[in-house]
Amino acid sequence: MAVPKKKTSKSRRNMRRSHLALGKVNVIVDSQTGEYKLPHHVSLIDGTYNNRQVVTKKIETEEEVA
């Protein structure tokens, strides 16, 4: 089993971990619904992208649900 020859210092350990920090999520306000969404993604609320309808929601009937 591999064992380190020298103890890793707190400074070196923390410098290694500095790349693991999470970054901010870039969100924008949708112009039609006013909800937050990711840029360059289809709106999950109404299925629009670039002010155009690209996804139509399937309306579930009571027979399909049961």
From Swiss-Prot:
The lineage of its organism: Bacteria, Pseudomonadati, Pseudomonadota, Alphaproteobacteria, Rickettsiales. One of its GO terms (cellular component) is large ribosomal subunit. GO terms for biological process: translation. GO terms for molecular function: structural constituent of ribosome. Signal peptide: none annotated. HAMAP family: Ribosomal_bL32. InterPro entries: Ribosomal_bL32, Ribosomal_bL32_bact, Ribosomal_zn-bd. Keywords: Ribonucleoprotein, Ribosomal protein. The keyword Transmembrane helix does not apply. Gene3D superfamilies: Single helix bin. This is Large ribosomal subunit protein bL32. NCBIfam families: rpmF_bact. It comes from the Bacteria. The keyword Plastid does not apply. It comes from Rickettsia bellii (strain OSU 85-389). Belongs to the bacterial ribosomal protein bL32 family.
